[in-house]
UniProtKB/Swiss-Prot annotation:
Species of provenance: Photobacterium profundum (strain SS9)
Gene name in the database record: apaG
GO biological processes: error-free translesion synthesis
Signal sequence region: none
Domain ApaG: 3-127
Entry protein name: Protein ApaG
Length: 127
């Protein structure tokens, strides 16, 4: 393990229900999510892979794993950020998504950057 601690990574998520692509009568609810990944540490961090756990209101779970995000493995320099938008489909009007990124440091170490659970919900479903 390096004497230097890994960079501090903060993630901000904004979700959006895509009504025009959704089909509630067929249990198809489409959501986009935009994630901004900020590197608040010292040194660069490269996003190597992602892990997502998506759970709908019925408890149905879907795990998504893969290299990078949206076809990229961005290197995020100190005090910089990377933003991308992707999407998911669930069978209920409410769900939750959470996960992490595996990041690589300049010295070849890897660490997890956690993404706290965030809600997927059609507008006005929750008061």
């Amino acid at each position: 393990m390096s004497a230097n601690s890994p960079p501090t990574i903060k993630c901000n998520v904004v979700t959006h229900y895509i009504e025009e692509q959704s089909e509630p009568n067929n249990q198809r609810y489409v959501f986009s999510y935009t994630i901004t990944i900020r590197n608040l540490g010292k040194g660069s961090a490269k996003l190597l892979s992602r892990y997502w756990l998506i759970t709908d209101a019925n408890g149905k779970r879907l795990v998504i794993e893969g290299e990078g995000v949206v076809g990229e493995q961005p290197e995020i320099k100190m005090n910089e950020e990377y933003t991308y938008t992707s999407g998911t489909i669930i069978e209920t009007p409410l769900g939750v998504m959470q996960g992490h990124y595996v990041m690589g440091t300049e010295d070849g170490e890897t660490f997890k950057a956690e993404v706290s659970p965030f809600r997927l919900a059609i507008p006005n479903i929750l008061h």
